[in-house]
Amino acid sequence: MASTQVNPTRMELTRLKKKLATATRGHKLLKDKRDELMRQFLDLVRENMALRQKVEAGIRSANVNFVIAKAGMSEQALNTALAAPKQAVYLEADKKNVMSVDIPVFHYKTRTADENDIYSYGFAFTSSDLDGAVKSLADILPDMLRLSETEKACQLMAAEIEKTRRRVNALEHVIIPEARKNIKYITMKLDENERRDRKSTRLNSSHVSIS
């Protein structure tokens, strides 16, 4: 029994009471953190699902247009049209701290602001379906980046939730109950010692009176 190994002194009792107060405050703070993490995690999961559907729809649309364009163009003409892109995308990775979790944030910029620069070819020898494929992919770029952010954020927040849950459980089921048990044990021992001392004092007083 762990409590029998505790030194039953008032100093130890004071220390344990402080430890219990700290653990109780920490338990509440960690529970609040866990609950807020769960709330934000669920928001991210919902956003992630919506983004995934949107991105997959955009990719499907691009694939359909590309297949149609490929069927109506020679392979050489298609390869030539896509060989030298005019536009370029520059990506910067940053991070923001959310509830002690470093969440990735992506920023991008294009080489030029001209929307037509996504087309690396002239329109004389290509089909409108190829234009549609290129436009679909260009349009979903922001959502693809945001999807990457939310995917990683969900992974990181899930790990933090699990870590916080273990700490809450350790406080709730081990540290706090053990501190309370030890406080109860020391209090009982101190009361026993006090009663024994009072009894001993009365006996000594009686002996003195008789003599």
Predicted stretch roles:
Residues 1-202:
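Charge-rich amphipathic alpha-helical interaction elements
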Residues 203-211:
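Single conserved hydrophobic/aromatic residue that forms the stacking wall/gate
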